[in-house]
């Protein structure tokens, strides 16, 4: 039997409800990023492959063309440094969205993320905020091997100062991403 979602959104079999659009998960993420970039000039998107012709599996498709290469840009393979760049930009008043396409390599960012970004608000009595969104894709296909397919949310959910969301529907993905960027 078909399972119909409770929320007013398309079901999982691609059938839309009357007067509803059908969006894929990557399309929902892309729409959220596009809206956030359009609403707030402090928002920028960085990460490996965000300006790729495939657009991070469609999640960032052509956003670099629409918003410009200064607001949506590719980064080198240097996770530790880039988390520091994102955290520093956030402390400086920007609203970075760091696309980290392999959660396994978030371990390389632990010092910047866990010892600094997540704790600065506590360390400075709420005077310093780090409005940083880290987007990590889990379970994006077969053949990812042991170091490219871990689900590490259990570790991150225990870090004070981090807010962890795991949207399971397109509707939630768009809404939670917009909320996280605005928070």
How does the language model describe each region?
Residues 2-183:
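Thiamine diphosphate
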């Amino acid at each position: 039997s078909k399972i119909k979602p409770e929320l007013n959104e398309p079901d999982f079999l691609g059938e839309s409800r009357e007067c509803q659009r059908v969006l894929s998960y990557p399309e929902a993420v892309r729409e959220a990023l596009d809206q956030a970039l359009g609403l707030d000039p402090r928002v920028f998107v960085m990460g490996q492959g965000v300006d790729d012709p495939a657009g991070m599996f469609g999640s960032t498709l052509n956003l670099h063309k629409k918003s410009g290469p200064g607001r949506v840009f590719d980064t080198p393979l240097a996770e530790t440094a880039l988390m520091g760049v994102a955290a520093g930009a956030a402390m400086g008043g920007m609203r970075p969205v760091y696309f980290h396409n392999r959660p396994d390599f978030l371990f390389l960012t632990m010092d910047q993320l866990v010892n600094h970004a997540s704790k600065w608000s506590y360390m400075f009595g709420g005077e310093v905020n780090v409005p940083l969104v880290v987007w990590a894709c889990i379970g994006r296909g077969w053949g990812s091997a042991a170091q490219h397919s871990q689900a590490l949310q259990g570790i991150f959910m225990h870090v004070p100062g981090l807010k962890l969301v795991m949207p399971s529907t397109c509707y939630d993905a768009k809404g939670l991403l917009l909320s996280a960027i605005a928070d």
